[in-house]
Amino acid sequence: MRYLVRLSVPRAGGWRAWGTTRDEFGHQLAEQESAAIVLHVDSEIRRGRDYVRVIVLATVDADDVAEALDLAWWAFRKAAGEDLAGWDLAAAEAEVRPEGH
């Protein structure tokens, strides 16, 4: 079954810090794509200069919701790589639903 996973994760350091890593993160995210998962940065929500929340959308082939979320979260963390500390993972949010619903 195909699922749409929406990950919403604040970027530590705000808009400027995100601006310096945005392209590299997008490149790393694209490298995680396979026949089972397609990901991209969908949007950025900015609140002042010290806050930005990055929205990543993933289309995932999985057996169930838990597997879809696990695959998307793994791909996000892999794309973040050594810069994982640059994300406020404790404030991350996720939404998973069957594609087309």
What are the roles of these predicted feature ranges?
Residues 20-29, 68-76:
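Short amphipathic alpha-helices in soluble, non-transmembrane regions
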